Amino acid sequence: MQHARKKFRVGRTSSHNRCMLANMLKSLIHNERIETTLPKAKELRRHADKMVTLAKKNTLAARRLAVGRLMVRYNTLTGKEARQVKAGDLSAYNVDRRVIGKLFDVLATRFSSRNGGYTRILKLQNRVGDNAQKCIIEFLAD
């Protein structure tokens, strides 16, 4: 019997939470460091560590699970991406593809000898407007 199961609750609907976590995960993998609030970072740390562990398996099934969890869209472009491609800039063409590649190629090999604990949270000063605890979540430089 599990009493008081932890749930990610930040005052949004479940679909909004799911999309927000997927977007934050993509940003964290792409930039390897993001600034956010402490409750979001604590939840993101759980998911980021699971994604790196999944990437270390390096199987087709693991890639498909990662694509699903990150909500990667291969065949659609956002308005911004479409404008950049039309202007001739192909560097921003479907960033999600590069995120999956970086997860499985760069991060999985970097943490191949490590068994968990791939991220760290550094606390910052509180935000001025609403006094929310800010922090930086980043992958270790192992």
From Swiss-Prot:
Superkingdom classification of source: Bacteria
Pfam families listed in its UniProt record: Ribosomal_L17 (PF01196)
UniProt entry keywords in alphabetical sequence: Ribonucleoprotein, Ribosomal protein
Cellular component GO terms held in the UniProt record: cytosolic large ribosomal subunit
GO molecular function: structural constituent of ribosome
Protein family according to the UniProt entry: Belongs to the bacterial ribosomal protein bL17 family.
Protein name: Large ribosomal subunit protein bL17
Species whose genome carries this gene: Chlamydia muridarum (strain MoPn / Nigg)
Origin organism lineage: Bacteria, Pseudomonadati, Chlamydiota, Chlamydiia, Chlamydiales
Gene assigned in the entry: rplQ
